């Protein structure tokens, strides 16, 4: 099941910062300079964490927050383009 997730980071070295930003751009949408929102499964999140662990150091900090549907619908920004869309409808195969 997919969930909205908020990922923010504080990377101490510019080269690593660029690498982390490039990886994050492949997984989600930038909301602020070092804050991204992604819509992913738990497995996709683990893949992201694994990729980021390969390029970061112990001094770097990455924060992951999984949002429930109600919390995600209550998240707002000043820019209309950054409004959190509703989760796409999922199909159940019976």
UniProtKB/Swiss-Prot annotation:
Coiled coil: none annotated. GO terms for molecular function: metal ion binding; RNA endonuclease activity. It comes from the Bacteria. It is an enzyme of class 3 (hydrolase). NCBIfam families: cas2. This is CRISPR-associated endoribonuclease Cas2. Belongs to the CRISPR-associated endoribonuclease Cas2 protein family. It comes from Leptospira interrogans serogroup Icterohaemorrhagiae serovar Lai (strain 56601). SUPFAM superfamilies: TTP0101/SSO1404-like. The keyword Nuclease applies. Keywords: Antiviral defense, Endonuclease, Hydrolase, Magnesium, Metal-binding, Nuclease.
């Amino acid at each position: 099941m997919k969930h909205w997730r908020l990922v923010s980071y504080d990377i101490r070295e510019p080269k690593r910062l660029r690498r982390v930003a490039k990886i994050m751009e492949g997984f989600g949408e930038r909301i602020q300079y070092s804050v991204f929102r992604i819509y992913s499964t738990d497995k996709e999140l683990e893949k992201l964490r694994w990729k980021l662990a390969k390029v970061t150091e112990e001094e770097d900090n990455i924060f992951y927050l999984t949002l429930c549907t109600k919390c995600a619908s209550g998240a707002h920004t000043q820019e209309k383009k950054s409004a959190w869309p509703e989760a796409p409808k999922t199909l159940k195969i019976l």
